[in-house]
Amino acid sequence: MKLSEFENKIVYLVGGTSGIGLAIAKQLAAAGAHIMLLARTQSKLQQAQDQLKTLAKHDRQKIEYRCLDVSDHNATQTLMNELVSSFGVPNALINCAGRAIPEHVENISYQQFDDTMKINLYGCRNTVAALLPHMKENGGLIVNTSSLAGVIGVFGYSDYCASKFALIGYSEALRSEVKKYNIKVAVLCPPDTDTPGF
């Protein structure tokens, strides 16, 4: 989809309070999209909403937010079902939530590895699983944010690389399975980016 095609479209943006997610949200707001921001921290969601409202193309735009930890499958399923009823079925789902904690492989605890996988990989799986049944009827777009570190291993980020490599594989398989519903799947693989995460 071209940016201009997002006018009056409904976009669910996960992890849109900083970095790449917020940059995408700003462009969508300026293009006239109705945006549902989803992230864990209410204060950051409020700040992002305030910024996006100043960029909105028209005063009929809906720019709202809800707190959500996408690593929680049940909470994600419940909230997404509620949002579909109150905000509408998304034309696009954009997954930008992620975490990266640099650490040598021998120092990465099971808990850190598990947490990284739950946010970076399972989080995307959880949002897709919750929304796909609703998106199948009208088609749409799913964007998962991986990384160049999902293509090339990076020193000191073994858990992050594992999650991002897996996300690319998941997204490519997803693309082949949902194309019959006219749902497109894109994977972003940005290099080092000047964001709070890096």
Predicted regions and their residues:
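Substrate-binding pocket helix/loop in short-chain dehydrogenase/reductase
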Residues: 104-105, 109-115
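The beta1-alpha1 cofactor-binding region of Rossmann-like NAD(H)/NADP(H)-dependent oxidoreductases
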Residues: 43, 67-78, 110
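Conserved NAD(P)H cofactor-binding loop of Rossmann-fold oxidoreductase domains
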Residues: 96-101
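Conserved glycine-rich cofactor-binding loop
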Residues: 10, 15-18
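Active-site helix of classical SDR
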Residues: 128, 163
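Conserved glycine-rich Rossmann-like NAD(P)H-binding loop of the short-chain dehydrogenase/reductase
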Residues: 33-48
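Residue(s) in the substrate-gating loop at a strand-loop-helix junction
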Residues: 147
